[in-house]
Amino acid sequence: MPTPLAAPPPDRAPSAPAAPPPAPDLAVVKERQRGAWSSGDYAVVGTTLQIVGETLCEALDLRAGSRVLDVAAGNGNATLAAARRWCDVTSTDYVESLLDRGRERAAAERLDVAFQVADVEALPFDDGAFDAVLSTFGAMFTADQERAAAEMWRVCRPGGRIGLANWTPSGFVGQVFRTIGAHVPPPPGLRSPALWGTPERLAELFPHAASIAAPTRSFVFRYRSPAHWLDIFRAWYGPMLKAFAALPEDGRAALERDLLALIDRFNVARDGTMVVPSEYLEVVLAKP
């Protein structure tokens, strides 16, 4: 006969469910993010991603004369790609030093682009002001994801399109985020930017889209060696620079080891160089 289960002692109350983590102070998070993106020089890294802006503009089938807004534009990869297609482009970011790099690049190519400091979570434009709204690896880093998505949707005209390039959680860059977060945890309750690289999250952020096309693409990081990639990102990529600066010496060494191990897992080169494909979603949303 099976032994009956013993009843819990009468004086032992059932365990209370764990309290949810407190909501992060998004204003504080945003200011920290602004400080991170203002440090280093993102353009050193960002210009290597130019091809992503070009292919996104092709996916959107941009036409000459279209009113195009690039949000969280950084050093202007999508901005320049749209301007090269003779679109009427407005390039925005909340970090003016990043826009300065975009201005320099546009001037070098004699491209006519309007640059304006603006936060994607509070865009200073009228409803439906643009035919297309773009962001390559930019809007995904906003503190308030729902508000950023709502603002992009608002300023896009009916019948217009929103184009995004977002790193996936399982790809190389998504795993870089995860590795850094294991050493320098983000504020409790803050959503990962890599969620923008999932169809499920896109459907949540843009519930009224007439269609969402989000094929998986791959950008290939090519560097002299894994150590070369780490040196470049550690010196110039603001979020990584800040992460290393926040750690003691042994913590910095541990993060370096983990990042190099991650590169080794993704690296397809066997000649000492670094050739690492990184998945991202190339997103085209249609607004009815």
Task: Walk through the language-model features, giving the residues of each.
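N-terminal auxiliary segments of SAM/dcSAM-dependent transferases
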Residues: 2-27
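Conserved class I S-adenosyl-L-methionine
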Residues: 20-63, 77, 101, 108, ...
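Class I SAM-dependent methyltransferase SAM/SAH-binding core
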Residues: 67-122, 147
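A short acidic, Gly/Pro-enriched loop at the edge of an enzyme's catalytic core
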Residues: 121-132
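A short SAM/SAH-binding and catalytic strip from SAM-dependent methyltransferases
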Residues: 132-145
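Conserved catalytic/acceptor-binding region of the Class I
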Residues: 146-147, 153, 157-226, 244, ...
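Conserved Class I S-adenosyl-L-methionine
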Residues: 194-288
